Amino acid sequence: MLSVQLITPSSHGTAHLPRDDTDAAAGEILEFLCPFFCIGGIGDEYCDCQEKRDLDLFTDQ
């Protein structure tokens, strides 16, 4: 969940922003970036790198 701490003195708590569009955008961004993350060895947390390895997308041919 995306949250923003309000900085005005009269604010009480945290404002929560809707994520309808951000979830879709994040998915599209990861779809593009995951192959590069997996090649670099940094994608395992966010990407399904094992599936990409099984498809032989990372061969040196």
Swiss-Prot record:
* Propeptide intervals in chain numbering: 1-19, 52-61
Q: Where is this protein primarily located?
A: secreted
Q: List, alphabetically, the GO terms of the cellular component aspect.
A: extracellular region
Q: In which tissues is it expressed?
A: Expressed by the venom duct.
Keyword Cell membrane in the entry? The reply is no
Q: How is it modified after translation?
A: Mostly non-hydroxylated. Contains 2 disulfide bonds.
- Please tell me whether the keyword S-adenosyl-L-methionine is annotated for this protein: no
Molecular-function annotations in GO: ion channel regulator activity; toxin activity
Recorded superkingdom:
Eukaryota
- Keywords, alphabetical: Cleavage on pair of basic residues, Disulfide bond, Ion channel impairing toxin, Secreted, Toxin
Query: Where found in the cell?
Result: Secreted
Q: What is known of its domains?
A: The cysteine framework is XIV (C-C-C-C).
* Purpose: Probable toxin that inhibits ion channels.
Q: What protein name does the entry list? A: Conotoxin Am14.1
